[in-house]
């Protein structure tokens, strides 16, 4: 079977890790990268060395020329276009484009990639109008005529599988989510201007920063049965990677915490294997760096007040786990054509 050919627009945190994921698989192939702000030699350096995930040792990366990188012996075209319409994806053979700039997140803007020859676009961020899919939750609803889709957010990818299990087994009446989230590139290294979010302008490495998130509400888009039943907020904390969701819910069907744990464990070993994890080990955030799964339920960290009110805790590598799901979604879509 021919490999699925993928291009990446935006070689930031997610773009580079999606590239690493693709290069580790044998069912897809990286054929092009576009980033107008990074020179080809700097791309080589940024891909090879990573402060969180370590040096990339699976593929030797070399600079062939100003417009080509070599991953092992595989050439990857490099473009530097600011306007997505101008990126020659078709010329490079890219059927799928991962839109990971964080800029072109609505359908109209992302559609510009189609003019350059791409057939499908997967946005690696939430979108206000593109249909959102979470692998393990609603990817089966994808229809082949959808050319632009969103992989939702890393937090929605963590929360949705857990919420699905709880709602399917016990019914969710209502719930609140808090994500304790690692700092990201949009935050400030020292206090600086942030007119839309004053707290967000404070130094990331020195503060716990309350923040907004649409991740819980977005679950209602991928699981319509939960629409209006969940909302949430975030705390940005001074760690570089791995975040954790606290989901506190009131459930319809009374169940002990042991019964809830058993249900999650069963699903993690069944239909959601590889997506939802389960652990009873005494783990901390760094233990999940590089974890492929979207959501790893921490059985020892949760508590219940009574048989209808429970707090559930689930970890996620907000970089690596999410990037893995981006590629999984691409492969699912490729099989629906």
From Swiss-Prot:
Domain of life: Eukaryota
Residue ranges of the region described as Catalytic: 152-337
GO annotation, cellular component aspect: cytosol
EC id: 1.2.1.12
Localization, UniProt: Cytoplasm
GO biological process: glucose metabolic process; glycolytic process
EC primary class: oxidoreductase
GO molecular function annotations of the record: glyceraldehyde-3-phosphate dehydrogenase (NAD+) (phosphorylating) activity; NAD binding; NADP binding
PROSITE patterns: GAPDH (PS00071)
Database matches in CDD domains: GAPDH_I_C (cd18126), GAPDH_I_N (cd05214)
Catalyzed reactions per annotation: D-glyceraldehyde 3-phosphate + phosphate + NAD(+) = (2R)-3-phospho-glyceroyl phosphate + NADH + H(+)
Pathway note: Carbohydrate degradation; glycolysis; pyruvate from D-glyceraldehyde 3-phosphate: step 1/5
Keywords: Cytoplasm, Glycolysis, NAD, Oxidoreductase
SMART domains cross-referenced by the UniProt entry: Gp_dh_N
Active-site residues annotated for this sequence: 154
Pfam family membership, one: Gp_dh_N
Residue numbers binding D-glyceraldehyde 3-phosphate: 153-155, 184, 213-214, 236
Annotated spans, Binding to NAD: 1-151
Binding site for NAD(+): 13-14, 35, 82, 318
NCBIfam families: GAPDH-I
Described purpose of this protein according to its UniProt entry: Key enzyme in glycolysis that catalyzes the first step of the pathway by converting D-glyceraldehyde 3-phosphate (G3P) into 3-phospho-D-glyceroyl phosphate. Essential for the maintenance of cellular ATP levels and carbohydrate metabolism.
Additional record remark: Plants contain two types of GAPDH: cytosolic forms which participate in glycolysis and chloroplast forms which participate in photosynthesis. All the forms are encoded by distinct genes.
Family: Belongs to the glyceraldehyde-3-phosphate dehydrogenase family.
Protein name: Glyceraldehyde-3-phosphate dehydrogenase, cytosolic
Source organism (scientific name): Mesembryanthemum crystallinum (Common ice plant)
């Amino acid at each position: 079977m021919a490999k699925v050919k993928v291009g990446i627009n935006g070689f930031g945190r997610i773009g580079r890790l999606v590239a690493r994921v693709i290069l580790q698989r044998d069912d897809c192939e990286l054929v092009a990268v576009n980033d107008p702000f990074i020179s080809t030699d700097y791309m080589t350096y940024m891909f090879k060395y990573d402060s969180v995930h370590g040096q990339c040792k699976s593929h030797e990366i070399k600079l062939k020329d100003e417009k080509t990188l070599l991953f092992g012996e595989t050439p990857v075209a490099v473009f530097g276009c600011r306007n997505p319409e101008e990126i020659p994806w078709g010329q490079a053979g890219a059927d799928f484009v991962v839109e990971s700039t964080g800029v072109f997140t609505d359908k109209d803007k992302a559609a510009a990639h189609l003019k350059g020859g791409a057939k499908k676009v997967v946005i690696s961020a939430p979108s206000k109008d593109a249909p959102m899919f979470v692998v393990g939750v609603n990817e089966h609803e994808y229809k082949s005529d959808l050319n632009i889709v969103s992989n939702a957010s890393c937090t929605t990818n963590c929360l949705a599988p857990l919420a699905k299990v709880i709602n399917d087994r016990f019914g969710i009446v209502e719930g609140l989510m808090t994500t304790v989230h690692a700092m990201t590139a949009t935050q400030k290294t020292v206090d600086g201007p942030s007119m839309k979010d004053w707290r967000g302008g404070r130094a990331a490495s020195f503060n716990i920063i309350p923040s907004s998130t649409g991740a819980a509400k977005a679950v209602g888009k991928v699981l319509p049965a939960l629409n209006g039943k969940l909302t949430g907020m975030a705390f940005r904390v001074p760690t570089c990677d791995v975040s954790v969701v606290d989901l506190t819910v009131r459930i319809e069907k009374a169940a002990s915490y042991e019964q809830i744990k058993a249900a999650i464990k069963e699903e993690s070993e069944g239909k959601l294997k590889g997506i939802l994890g389960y652990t009873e080990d005494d783990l901390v955030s760094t233990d999940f760096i590089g974890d492929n799964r979207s959501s790893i339920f921490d059985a020892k960290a949760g508590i219940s007040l009574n048989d209808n009110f429970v707090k559930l805790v689930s970890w996620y590598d907000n970089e690596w786990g999410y990037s893995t799901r981006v590629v999984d979604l691409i492969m699912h879509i490729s099989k629906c054509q």
